[in-house]
Amino acid sequence: MNSSTFEVLWGVNNIYSVVEVNTNTVYEGVIKGKFLNTREKEYSPLVPGDFVCGDIYDEHKVYIKERMERRNVFWRYNKKVALRQVIVSNIDNILIVSSATLPEFKNSFIDRTLIVAEEQGITPIILVNKVDEGINLRVDSFIKIYEYLGYRVIKTSVVTLQGIDEVKKIIKNSRTSFIGQSGVGKSSLINVIDLNASQAINEISYKYARGRHTTVYAVAFHSDNKILIDTPGIKEFGIEGLGYLELKYYFKEFKYFNDLCRFNSCLHINEPNCFVISQIGFKIAEARYNSYLKIFSELKRYKSYAREIFGKN
């Protein structure tokens, strides 16, 4: 058997589509044995973007022996199994797609995805899609907030093609994943950005989604010196796997103020002489601070729950 390095494109029911790095030949891969050489229990042992070592044992089949170290992972917390669920790995950019109209623009979803991107060193870009249908004052105010923080925000439309060329420039020669809630138009965007990628992703989704043209599995596609990864629409984006004491480091607007509080251990909740709190409504948007409080409460509550139920520290 010949050993080689492969990249995972997608996987369904423990069968993976992998592409050999040196030849770009696609194989069907299965994990040899029960588990990979991972250090801890994982919900997603292999995801699109992973690199693996394996043995070719048939013309089109591979035994996957080892997962190589991940440069980064984009994850969310899976409440059903009480574990981090890795969605994609080894990416440069995460395109966070939201809608200017319907479904409703949810800043709470965006804030959580930004936190994971900050934690993992992934460049986040916010796409406000369907702008041809109009942008209300609430959405416009959040666009200004995120731009003020230094995040790149692109207004897009598959109808007028606004912002599409800008997105194409970003993803050129890079590894990029799309993420967003159901109905925000991720698949439609990919369709106008790269038709070949869209068709390939749709074929896989249609085959394994019982005839529905909707993304049900994360799927990677190589095209013109870039890698695009589409992901299923997400209803909830929990980040309970993150420690609540760390949260303040992933809110960009706190970065220059964390050391100006009276106490080094200040969590910016109700401590005296908290400089962060003094900046609410000035350098810090009230909506973002309220988001911080909500997420902080969720993480702290989960910490107590995990300690009681699972004995986790």
UniProtKB/Swiss-Prot annotation:
InterPro entries registered for this protein in UniProt: G_CP_dom (IPR030378), P-loop_NTPase (IPR027417), Ribosome_biogen_GTPase_RsgA (IPR004881), RsgA_GTPase_dom (IPR010914)
Chief place of localization: cytoplasm
CDD domains: YjeQ_EngC
Biological processes per GO annotation: ribosomal small subunit biogenesis
UniProt-listed Enzyme Commission number(s): 3.6.1.-
Cellular component aspect of the GO annotation: cytoplasm
Cofactor binding summary note: Binds 1 zinc ion per subunit.
Residue ranges of domain CP-type G in the record: 80-237
GO molecular function term, any single one: metal ion binding
Annotated TM spans: none
Gene3D superfamilies per UniProt: P-loop containing nucleotide triphosphate hydrolases (3.40.50.300), Probable gtpase engc, domain 3 (1.10.40.50)
Binding annotation for Zn(2+): C261, C266, H268, C274
HAMAP family registered for this protein in UniProt: GTPase_RsgA
This protein's name: Small ribosomal subunit biogenesis GTPase RsgA
